[in-house]
Design a protein with these regions (language model features):
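Non-ligating segments of multi-cofactor redox enzymes
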Residues: 1-263, 267-269, 274-514
């Protein structure tokens, strides 16, 4: 019965995670916090606090989870974690027909503690790297830039096929309108880093071919952190004298947490899934409250600890040395309200929550690659040729779980300078063809218009006299929203482009949620 309840809980929390993910769209109602799962990650909370050198109040749910882990053990991994649920489902498909003849090897178990120490050490030196391994961040990221756009593309193709068939057109249109309200994106969006993000996620699932929950057992640093706190639990597995030593519980344990002495459970590995009690024929296993000393040991020797520390320091040095291209840095435009670059990278966990919600408005945010150096990989940047920063939108700051993007009032945001637009006169139609083009000025959202015209009479190469409106940018008014670059009719590279010149970034910010 308990095992069935756990499975229902897993399904519920996965659906809740997906529902909150879909809720992150314009118009966004923050009464349903779409970032609550991200703010529940103790790994993201700890590494971000260490890297930013400040407590981030919005991550308080992560502290609550750690406090619950002390008496209850790693219940989050077995009952709540949405990535764990996805891995369980994937393992059922990948390992169909496979069974374990005995306890599997534990030689890789120390890797997750190695990764955890390396991440914490790097965070102490102000390098935020937990985003690559955090399961909640990983699932949010792959949904945003890979799975959700692919689902939307396939669904739209299905509707086009249905409409082309000529049958039940009215019903197709009704269904499509409903799905576009709740499920489908407002507009089709593609992301530059969708393939690498998808490959990482696929690799995590493919590890199930090696063993059940290989990622959770051996690589997940969040599981390692929860495992450290769960060693003091007062609720857990208990085996009575009815045990016949049949080893079925050990063979069915998805976390390899049951020792060769079947009465001993590694408290740092057990995820309270209750599967061992379900398969125990003499019903010798139960889960109950009661003080119990820590069983099992953290398999991380002094040598491995030193190696993990060195790995974190070397990783920090490698990313800091790998500077970005100077030209690309000049086009590395951050979202409005972003902290100063160093503080921004310290806090940003690369969850792509801002990218997700931006795709329902101006759709300018994309995950970066190395435009700002290796330290900035997968951090959000504005690519104005694919989108623009909506003048009446502040959603990226509202949904950021760590405060890397500050919350701005609309009036403040509309004056916040992301950068400055410049004309490439060798491509601009009025400048090189001597023909009027008003597109950029017409789309400029500022009431006073940051793009103006210098109207002059000129002679064409054919000797004809004509009056041409030559556009120019009022740099003191331009906020760098990028809609001019996005709407520029010139094929290929736009004739007007936004750079970081004059950008306004917050030098210091109060802790997120304060």
């Amino acid at each position: 019965m308990a095992n069935r309840i756990r499975k229902l809980a897993q399904i519920f929390f996965l659906l809740l995670f997906l529902g909150l993910f879909l809720h992150a769209r314009f118009p966004y109602e923050s009464g349903w916090p779409s970032d609550i799962f991200l703010r529940t990650s103790p790994l993201a909370a700890l590494t971000t606090a260490l890297s930013a050198r400040t407590w981030i109040a919005s991550m308080l749910p992560a502290v609550l989870l750690l406090l619950l882990t002390i008496p209850l053990g790693r219940f989050f991994c077995g009952w709540i974690c949405p990535l764990g649920t996805v891995i369980d489902g994937s393992d059922r498909c990948l390992r169909r027909g496979k069974s374990s003849a005995g306890r599997e090897s534990v030689r890789f178990r120390s890797w997750k503690f190695f990764i955890l120490v390396a991440l914490l050490c790097a965070a102490l030196f102000s390098w935020q790297a937990a985003w690559f391994f955090d399961p909640l961040v990983m699932l949010t990221r792959v949904l945003t830039v890979s799975l959700y756009p692919a689902m939307a593309l396939l669904t739209q193709g299905l509707f086009q096929f249905g409409l082309a068939s000529g049958m039940a057109e009215e019903q197709w249109y009704t269904l499509y309108a409903w799905m576009q309200t709740w499920l489908l994106p407002v507009q089709s969006t593609s992301f530059e880093q969708s393939i690498p993000v998808l490959l990482l996620f696929t690799g995590v699932l493919a590890l199930g071919l090696v063993s059940r929950r290989f990622w959770c057992r051996n690589l997940c640093p969040l599981g390692a952190l929860l495992g450290l706190f769960s060693r003091f639990r007062v609720f857990g597995r208990s085996v009575d004298q009815n045990c016949t030593s049949c080893s079925l519980c050990q063979r069915r344990c998805r976390m390899n947490a049951i020792e060769d002495d079947y009465t001993i459970t590694d408290s740092a590995e057990c995820i309270q899934c209750n599967e061992c009690a379900t398969v125990c024929k003499p019903q010798a296993i139960s889960y109950r409250f009661g003080w119990r000393k820590s069983q099992g040991r953290i398999d991380l020797s002094r040598r491995r600890f030193i190696q993990a520390t060195a790995t974190g320091i070397v990783g920090l040095a490698a990313t800091r040395v790998g500077a970005g291209n100077r030209n690309e840095i000049g086009r590395l435009i951050r979202p409005p309200g972003a902290l100063a670059e160093e503080a921004f990278l310290d806090r940003c966990i690369r969850c792509q929550a801002c990218v997700r919600i931006c795709s329902s408005t101006g759709a300018c945010l994309q995950p970066a690659l190395t435009q700002g150096g290796w330290e900035g990989v997968w951090s959000p940047r504005a690519v104005m040729r694919t989108g623009y920063c909506e003048y009446n939108c502040t959603l990226c700051g509202e949904i950021c779980p760590t405060g890397a993007i500050g919350k701005l009032d609309l009036a403040v945001k509309q004056q916040n300078k992301m950068g400055t637009a410049y004309f490439d006169k060798s491509r601009c139609i009025p400048w090189y063809r001597l023909e009027d083009c008003l597109v950029c000025e017409e789309h400029c959202p500022l009431p006073e218009k940051a793009i103006r015209f210098d109207e002059r009479e000129v002679r064409t190469p054919q000797g004809e006299m004509r009056t041409v409106k030559f556009p120019y940018v009022r740099e003191d008014l331009c906020i760098g929203c990028g809609i001019c670059e996005n709407k520029c009719p010139v094929v290929g590279q736009a004739a007007i482009f936004v750079t970081t010149a004059g950008e306004e970034r917050q030098q210091a910010a109060p802790p997120a949620g304060a």
